[in-house]
Amino acid sequence: MKNILLLILVCLGNMWTLKAQEHPVIYASASDKATILQKIADEEWAKEAFTKIRGNVEKYADRHTADPQWIISRLAMYWKEGERYTQCYLKNQNWDRGEGDAPVPTVRMPGMRTWNKYYNVPLEDRQPYNETGDMLGLNRQNPSAPPILVPYKESGHMVRGNNVEILTLAENAAFVYWVTGEEKFARFAADIFNTWLIGTYYMNPILDPEKSTGGTGGWEPGGICGYYDYEQIHDDLALHAATVYDFLYDYLKANPHVHLKEIGKETKEIAGVVFKRFIDIGFIRGGKSGNWNVNGWNMILRPILVLEENETYPDGKGKDYYLHYLTNESTIYHDAIPDMVKTYDPVTGLWPESPGYSFGTIQMLLDWAILLKRSGIDVIADNPILQKAAMAVFPWMDDAANMVVFGDSRGGSANFLTFENLLTYYTQTANKKGIESTASALNKGLSLGKYNRSNAGWTGICTYAPTIPVVKSETSERTSYSPHHRFITMKNWTGPFKMMAALYGGTDGYHLTANGLALQLYGYGYALAPDAAAYESYWSKDHVYHQSPVGANTILPGYSEGKIVIEAMEPMVESGKFVNEKALTPFLNFADISAGEKRRTVALVRTSDSDGYYIDIFRSDLNDNDYLFHNVGTNLEVVDVRGNILPFNQQDKFERMYHAGYEWFTNIRKTEYARNFIASWTMPENITARLWMTGEKGRQIYKVDAPATTLNKGLTPGNVSMPPSVTPTLIVRQEDNNAKAHPFVSVYEAYKGDTPHVKQVTAMSVRDCAGVKVLTGNKREDYVFSATDSQVYSLASRTFFSGTFGLISEVGGKIYSMYLGKGRLLQKGNYSLEAEQNVYATIYQVDGNWFYSATGPVKVKIGKMERILDEGYNKLLNIK
């Protein structure tokens, strides 16, 4: 009988062993190791990536061998005996006080919920065994300034950032150990992890007696407070610690922390307790929907994945329990994936918030998809909108593969990990079309130098497909429109000189901005006339400038947010689409948008493969208006049309301010000038931007220094207009002169070298029709028309126009092209486009051959030839 009982116990023990989760499990498993080693050996990018990872962490691992306290002492902890707090308290969303004294140092809580303008000095310069929590910091607005000691209660996210940095080193070391078996990396990572684990184990969730974060703190549901951050969506210490635990599982089991031996506990048990604290608090805090929900789940997914089966834990809540609520069933606190994906616009594939959140969320979801597929859950197959959401990045990407900036987004390179995750999935599922589309995106990033696979990190080594197939590049769209975001992109990338503009209305909410009817203009891979995005944080004083109409290229006062109406646009985005499917001509884009009392017509005019210019006709049905135009650069000069510098007088302040954001303008200079003028911005990389503006009565011109444009390197030529530099800004004030009848009309170009392409701009306006004649360097004369009614206007000799937008181009005195945007008539001499109903139509020459395009029936006259043509696109006209 004893032998039978012993056999039963042995069998039960073996069953338990079989049910226990094997490690690693999150990004790789033991069975993947050979494949990963082969990838490192065979693929140059993986070899370089691994070399970088090892090189970045090995110096610390070697130092740890000789001085094991060096890295540990730099963790932000409550080090001082008698003040090793076990319970901390919040007040006004910031750390207030602590009580209790643990037998070991406990992990320090952040000083504040909000950000500040400082970031930590290098690890080597940080104070070891810092008992006060005061942090040495460098100023983001002036990085060259000496570091200052930032008080603990004013330290923003510096404390958490410090610990995340050290845990990230431990992650890298743990991966290197798993690949190589070299114990120095394991010892380094284990000592960091164990110190963090035990120091967290003795800390209770923070209490918030005044309910400043919307809940009571502790274990009670509700509010936004996490376990180790005052916003659960930033509560990321366990995210990093979980991967250390995963790769080091066997080593940690064999080499437990000395304190665990003293209290008779195992690493696995304490890790489960600590990880479940982060998870359980995350389950009942944060936000139910939107980016808060996605970010909240992102904080706890990796800790969930390292948990054991449900029955391992006294509460019956293990890996499968929590995954059910991520993948299947929403709760009153958080939506599950099936409800998350309903947030995406089924037409555009876009998330409703600003670009940073829009593409940050899809990146997280696709990252989860790769991890969940390892657990047998295919969220991509079940939710095809995820693929559409990933591809929605292209219309919102410029030709340098940077994201558009509006709302509270900061900009920067597109996240190519999105496409790597999709390529991995498509490779696993043998989806040829998917492989081609994602490979095209990745190859573009590689060719532009915006993406380098050798920077993949250990997660990429684990999950990326070994190679990116070489495929044909996909043709870029010409126009995109998101009605929810009130955002239009216009692109003309048909030649080496690539043109792009963004035209958009304002939205209050969704991390978007009440920015007015705004415009951004691009050149040479940069947003040269951008939207301001260098604010410190949501809570900083400069937010009122950067996240307002004052930080945008618009007109004040008046419309700042609300519905926009597309009066005309071509290439047109049809209803139910995100991008255009057809285009009338390779040489022109335009859009005419109204919003409130404002109406703005913007056109991209390509004059050759290497040149082009932008038209901006901005109407405002107010008598007093300020036209704001920000352009990055080192200098702004304003001259008359003969090149004479206009005299400006220094001003202490504006006589009138239309928004509190005006307070952020400095170095105010003013001149009164009612004639045509030229504003020029000088930039690094030998780039100059020029804006010609036609004159109107009641004009005052201001040159001001606006705050920096961006905090991100690589978004401006030579990183100009980054802190502590300024953004040279033009303000054209028009008083007692209604700008609907007398609009702001400008022509903008960017060029390299000393020779501008636009030589002369002449106004030609009559009543509700505004126009200019543009003379360019290749003996080309363009006649531009913009009207707000259906009357027939004649602005120049032998010309007639009835429509929303028109362009007649002559080269050497001979008509080269004609373009009619939503109109009935465009004529010069014996060349004309005429229709009974409003149409979009054009005739143009390529290599001496005439082509036509039209959205409906149109009578075309070219010299003696006259024909009635039906709808068609880029069709050859056989004219002898």
What are these regions (language model features)?
Residues 378-454:
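C-terminal, helix-dominated tail/subdomain
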Residues 682-778:
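Beta-strand-rich recognition/accessory modules
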Residues 631-698:
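Polysaccharide-binding surfaces and accessory modules of carbohydrate-active proteins
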Residues 24-51, 57, 61-67, 88-108, ...:
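Structural helix-adjacent loops and short alpha-helical linkers that scaffold large soluble proteins
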Residues 731-742, 749-880:
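Non-catalytic terminal regions with compositionally biased, polar/charged low complexity
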Residues 448-659, 738-740, 746-754, 762-766:
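Catalytic and substrate-binding regions of extracellular carbohydrate-active enzymes
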Residues 159-390, 410:
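Aromatic-lined, polymer-binding surfaces characteristic
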Residues 1-21:
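Bacterial Sec-dependent N-terminal signal peptides
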